[in-house]
């Protein structure tokens, strides 16, 4: 069974490995991700609005 110190060492070793593999996105990639995220947020909001309006029409409250 691993001790707390060994668990921490393993965690930081895995963290370091992940950080070495990752890279900073370019401006084009960042803009695309921001657009997709924004569109997703708007769609989720619109779906919630439609559900709320349907509920309002059904209950009449």
UniProtKB/Swiss-Prot annotation:
Q: Which family does it belong to?
A: Belongs to the SecE/SEC61-gamma family.
Name of the molecule in the record: Protein translocase subunit SecE
Spell out the GO cellular component terms annotated for this protein, sorted alphabetically and separated by semicolons: plasma membrane
Pfam assignment, any one: SecE
What HAMAP family does UniProt report for this protein, alphabetically?
SecE (MF_00422)
Instruction: Indicate where this protein is primarily found.
Output: membrane
UniProt cross-references to InterPro entries, sorted A to Z = Prot_translocase_SecE_dom_sf, Translocase_Sec61-g, Translocase_SecE/Sec61-g
Q: Which GO terms describe its molecular function?
A: protein transmembrane transporter activity
Q: What does this protein do?
A: Essential subunit of the Sec protein translocation channel SecYEG. Clamps together the 2 halves of SecY. May contact the channel plug during translocation.
- GO BP term, example: intracellular protein transmembrane transport
NCBIfam families named in the record: PRK09400.1-4, secE_euk_arch
How this chain sits in the membrane, per its record, is:
Single-pass membrane protein
Give coiled-coil spans as residue ranges.
none
Q: Where in the cell is it found?
A: Cell membrane
Q: Which UniProt keywords apply?
A: Cell membrane, Membrane, Protein transport, Translocation, Transmembrane, Transmembrane helix, Transport
The organism named in the record is: Thermococcus onnurineus (strain NA1)
- The superkingdom of the source organism is Archaea
**Which residue windows are transmembrane per the record?**
38-58
**Subunit info?**
Component of the Sec protein translocase complex. Heterotrimer consisting of SecY (alpha), SecG (beta) and SecE (gamma) subunits. The heterotrimers can form oligomers, although 1 heterotrimer is thought to be able to translocate proteins. Interacts with the ribosome. May interact with SecDF, and other proteins may be involved.
